[in-house]
A protein has these predicted regions:
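Active-site-adjacent structural elements that line small-molecule/cofactor binding pockets in enzymes
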Residues: 1-254
């Protein structure tokens, strides 16, 4: 597949955007759209490390009406912390507000085990729980009537209407072997981070091989942390500081 014409570029939501007036928020987002950026990107955490976080779907809902030229990318949504019926309804509602503009990235998190514990979720089950929820959400967003998996979710005859038109791409994030398998089995693509171009290309091959029987319209992405400085060392220092502050890990761990 020739992907040379499929490239899109997004930018993370400005950290101070919520503190600005609606007029200033619109001005900044308009400047992003004027620059040719395709989408705005936001993360998702319930209570990360010191209690900080943001509900990614709520933030994108707020942004959706401020600049209609920009698509909306959630990366990544901690699905294991939500019930799949509720998550599917929220995704469907946002897709109705911004048809054709929403992409939802799904991840398992885990950098902060306490975030899962305070939500009543065993961190050790987050991968299997995400797999179960992702399979259910995909069927729900296709308009199917589903039953819970019997291990994590116990319900019958769940359904979400109306279904999003067009369908919402569900992209799976992560670097592990399990993440690549999850992307191939359940996703419409893979969202990579902290990997080389070679590793990115290899990961895409693995994902598409696993998902060959489904043959979706693959949409892969690579998340980059970029530091703008006076030179390479200054730019690297800015990135390393921000990543260490956010993840509470030494930069070299990445």
């Amino acid at each position: 597949m020739d992907r040379s014409t499929d490239l899109q570029v997004g930018i993370s939501t400005p950290w101070d955007l919520p503190s600005l007036s609606p007029t200033e928020q619109r001005r900044r987002l308009a400047a992003v759209a004027d620059a040719g950026i395709d989408h705005v990107f936001t993360a998702d955490h319930v209570s990360f490390h010191d209690g900080t976080g943001i509900d990614g779907l709520v933030r994108l809902a707020a942004l959706s009406g401020l600049e209609p030229r920009l698509d909306l990318y959630l990366g990544v949504y901690l699905l294991a912390l939500r019930h799949p019926m509720v998550a599917a309804r929220q995704i469907a509602t946002l897709a109705e507000l911004a048809p054709g503009r929403l992409t939802v990235g799904i991840g398992v998190g885990g950098e902060d085990r306490h975030e899962f514990e305070v939500c009543g979720v065993d961190p050790g089950t987050r991968g299997r729980r995400t797999n179960a929820a992702l399979a259910l959400i995909r069927d729900l967003l296709d308009g199917e009537t589903v039953a819970g998996d019997g291990e994590f979710y116990d319900f019958d005859e769940g359904r979400i209407l109306p279904t999003p038109k067009p369908a919402v791409p569900l992209i799976v994030g992560g670097r592990s072997k399990a993440a690549l398998e999850r992307a191939g089995r359940y996703g419409d693509g893979w969202l990579a981070a902290w990997c080389s171009p070679r590793r990115f290309a290899e990961g895409i091959e693995i994902v598409e091989s696993i998902g060959a029987d489904r043959a979706p319209d693959w949409r892969h992405g690579l998340q980059l942390w970029i530091g703008v400085g006076t030179d390479v060392d200054d730019g690297r220092a800015q990135v390393s500081r921000r990543m260490a502050e956010f993840y509470k890990l030494d930069f070299e761990a990445f």
